[in-house]
Amino acid sequence: FRTMRVTAEKEQKKLLSRNEASGPVFKIRNDPRHTGIGKFLAHTGLDEIPQLYNVLRGDMTLFGPRPLPVAEAAKLKSWQKKRHDIKPGIISPAILTGTYHEDFDAWMKSDIAYVKEKSLGYDVRLAVRALSFLTGLMERAVANP
């Protein structure tokens, strides 16, 4: 399913001045390109459900660095590319700690730390944190649609 309008990529060029992210990525809170239902799905995290298919296929894991669009990944510095040493994941430590929306270098460092420290114990801790995080997202999305 689609959470953004078909013209989202073209519209991004017009929205570059509103980019809230540092580094080579494009992020806008309350992105105007979302469809009505897409906004709800994105705010609750339900837009990630189709990614479970990629996990079942073996292309992704539940936990790990979030994949970047190809054009953005091509702009990474060499040290930042270490995040690609493992398969991408649906749930990133950077999302759970908030560095995903802060500083790009902090986000990359969080991803690389996960690559270096990856273990079953780390994934269990992330799973517990993710459940708490998703519960909070759902509550906020229902309270503020």
Identify the residue ranges that each predicted region occupies.
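Conserved small/aromatic sequence motifs within transmembrane helices
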Residues: 1-145
